[in-house]
Amino acid sequence: MLTTMDSPLSDTAERGDPVGAWLSLPRRIYLDTSTLQKLYDFGGEIFEGEPFEPGGRAARVQGLAGEIDALRRIFMINERAMFEFVVTEASLREVVNRAHPRYTQWVYDVLDTWLIQSEGEQPPTPGRTFDDRHFGMISVKDSQLLQEALDWRCDAFMTMERRLPTAATFIERETGLRVMRPTTYCDLLRPFARLYY
């Protein structure tokens, strides 16, 4: 459990500005392929409230239960909060390359939701922020996804990966984009969850 001092919102909370804290929540969140895969694999647990009973490799993934529970809470809150979850062509290319037809169709359905939400927006001009050499520690694939998140004016980039969030502070400082795991986003939402239940 986070205390106010440990919370990512501690600056705002300490100033007694709950409205400012609420307004600072990421509302347009890019879903990377690792997050999409977990949403697909554990859809029953996340969307239907089924018990989390991982098998095989998933049973050995440290912290997976917490991340799946965080996704469940995020999407429960989103039933009323109406945050935007962004899926783009770069994500879709990665998914199609996995050659899993049912998963691919599911991601197309998620993409359709985003296309409806973003209807009327002009497609962004592709940026080149992540081409800069000081982002060299980020993989080419992650750089493409992060760039699309920036291009679509996302507030946050959600990933289940462990490596990319280690660069979160640097990425946010350089670009304003917040890279976070589901548990991090859930911690940001926690003070406001009752507004949406």
Descriptions of predicted regions:
Residues 31, 36-100:
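PIN/NYN-family metal-dependent endoribonuclease catalytic core
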Residues 6-8, 61-64, 132-138:
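Short, flexible loop segments at the rims of nucleotide/cofactor-binding pockets, characterized by
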Residues 97, 104-107:
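Short, contiguous, well-structured surface segments enriched in hydrophobic/aromatic residues
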Residues 26-29:
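Residues that mark the start of a beta-strand
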Residues 35, 91, 144-145, 163-164:
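Alpha-helix capping/helix-boundary segments
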Residues 141:
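Acidic donor-binding loop at a coil-to-helix junction in glycosyltransferase catalytic cores
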Residues 2-22, 43-53, 135, 146, ...:
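Acidic, PIN/NYN-like endoribonuclease modules and their adjacent C-terminal/linker elements
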Residues 90, 94, 109-136:
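Acidic catalytic patch
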